[in-house]
Regions:
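A conserved hydrophobic position in a structured secondary element of the catalytic/binding core
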Residues: 22-23, 75, 156, 203
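Conserved core of the sugar-phosphate nucleotidyltransferase
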Residues: 75-167
C-alpha cells in the first residue's frame, strides 16, 4: 500500500520531492525495496503533521509541505496539484481537500469525516458526526444542504508547519480524534479545496475490499 501511495504522489510534476517518513524499520525496508526515498523519524510523534515537521526542518529551501497519509493508496496527482495551487493565494497557510460526492451512509459513518466551510471556503469545523445536523430537517438532508466530505490530505506553508507542531493538544481534537481541530482552535485558517476526484482511503479493515473493488471498476 505504501508503494501505491508513493508512486501516486510521484506523478505530480509540481512536487520537488517525495519522502516516506516513518518510525518503523519494516516500512523503511519496504520503501527501499521499490527504490523509494525514506527517512526514519522519532517514534514519539502524536500525529503525521508532527512527523512531517521533523522532516521539513532538515530542508531549508522548502516552502510548502504536503502530508500524504499512508492509508491513501489511490491518491491522485491532480489532488496534490490542486492543493499546491491553493498557495498561489499568499493568504493561504494550510489547505486540505473536500468532495461533495457523499451519500447518507458516509454522512452517518464516523470514519468518514465531514467539514463545513464559510463563504471563503475556509473550514468552520470538522466532525465524525453529521454536520450540519439534520435532526430537525423536514426535507431530505442531501437535497437541503451540499454536504462536504473531508479528504485527509494536508498542505502547509513551511513556516506555518513549524508553528502548529508547537501547539498544545486540545480537548476538542481529542474527543473527535481529529488533529486539524487543534489548528482551528488556535485560530489558523484551513482552506478547503473542492475536488471531484474520488479516492477511497483505508480507515478500517473493512475498507480494503471497497478499495479493491474501486480499483477493479476504475483502473
Amino acid at each position: 500500500m505504501i508503494q501505491r501511495v508513493y508512486e501516486g504522489a510521484k506523478k505530480s510534476k509540481m512536487l520537488s520531492d517525495v519522502i516516506v517518513a516513518t518510525d518503523d524499520e519494516r516500512i523503511v525496508a519496504a520503501v527501499k525495496s521499490f527504490g523509494g526515498k525514506v527517512i526514519m523519524t522519532k517514534d514519539s510523534h502524536p500525529s503525521g503533521t508532527d512527523r512531517c515537521g521533523e522532516i521539513a526542518a532538515n530542508f531549508e529551501d522548502v516552502d510548502v509541505v504536503i502530508n500524504i497519509q499512508g492509508d491513501e493508496p489511490l491518491v491522485d496527482f491532480r489532488q496534490l496539484d490542486a492543493l499546491i495551487k491553493a498557495f498561489n493565494d499568499q493568504d493561504v497557510q494550510i489547505a486540505t481537500l473536500g468532495i461533495r460526492d457523499i451519500d447518507m451512509e458516509a454522512i452517518l459513518n464516523p470514519n468518514r469525516i465531514k467539514v463545513v466551510v464559510n463563504n471563503e471556503n475556509q473550514a468552520l469545523y470538522f466532525s465524525r458526526s453529521p454536520i450540519p445536523n439534520f435532526a430537525h430537517s423536514k426535507e431530505n438532508p442531501l437535497t437541503q444542504y451540499p454536504y462536504l466530505r473531508h479528504i485527509g490530505l494536508y498542505a502547509y506553508r513551511a513556516d506555518t508547519l513549524k508553528k502548529i507542531i508547537q501547539l498544545a493538544p486540545t480537548a476538542l481534537e481529542q474527543i473527535e480524534s481529529l488533529e486539524q481541530l487543534r489548528w482551528l482552535y488556535y485560530g489558523f485558517a484551513i482552506k478547503v479545496v473542492e475536488t471531484n476526484i474520488e479516492t477511497p482511503n483505508i480507515d478500517v479493515p473493512e475498507d480494503v475490499a471497497k478499495v479493491l473493488d474501486f480499483i477493479v471498476d476504475f483502473f
